[in-house]
Structures are given as structure tokens and as C-alpha cells.
Amino acid sequence: MSRICQVTRKKRMIGNNRSHAMNAKKRQFLPNIQYHRFWIPEEKRFIKLRISAHGMRCIDKKGIELIIQEIGITKNKG
């Protein structure tokens, strides 16, 4: 599974490791992706998201309901 935040769409970046001699070696910069469950009081259920630390701060600021509308997650049929 790819390391992409479901809220901010952050993903890995490619860059260089640099030695003291300034030799370049390719490397990856990975986002801080975590699984987190959020309670949705209107639907009386939990939702599990794979989000970055920045995505968690966005949810704290805006609220889970607004973020769910922005990313387009709908109710489960069941």
C-alpha cells in the first residue's frame, strides 16, 4: 500500500543524501503516515483514516465533518 495521506494527499518525495564530499545519492523522504480512528457523532460510528501528522492537525482545526465532506467519504451501505 502506498504511503499517501487521505486528507492532505502528501506522498513520498525523492531527494539526495549528500556526503561531506557533496556526493549525491538518491533517497526518499517519507511522510509521517499513521492510522487513526475518528468518531463521527452524526453517524454514530468510527471512521478509520490513514493520515499524516499534518492531516491530524487539519482535522483538529477544521473538524472531522468538514474534512470528510472535502475528501468525499460517504456512509457505508450496511
UniProtKB/Swiss-Prot annotation:
Assigned GO CC terms: cytosolic large ribosomal subunit
Highest taxon of the lineage: Bacteria
Keywords: Ribonucleoprotein, Ribosomal protein
One GO-annotated biological process of the protein: translation
Gene Ontology molecular functions: structural constituent of ribosome
Homology family: Belongs to the bacterial ribosomal protein bL28 family.
PANTHER family: 39S RIBOSOMAL PROTEIN L28, MITOCHONDRIAL, LARGE RIBOSOMAL SUBUNIT PROTEIN BL28M
Protein name per UniProt: Large ribosomal subunit protein bL28
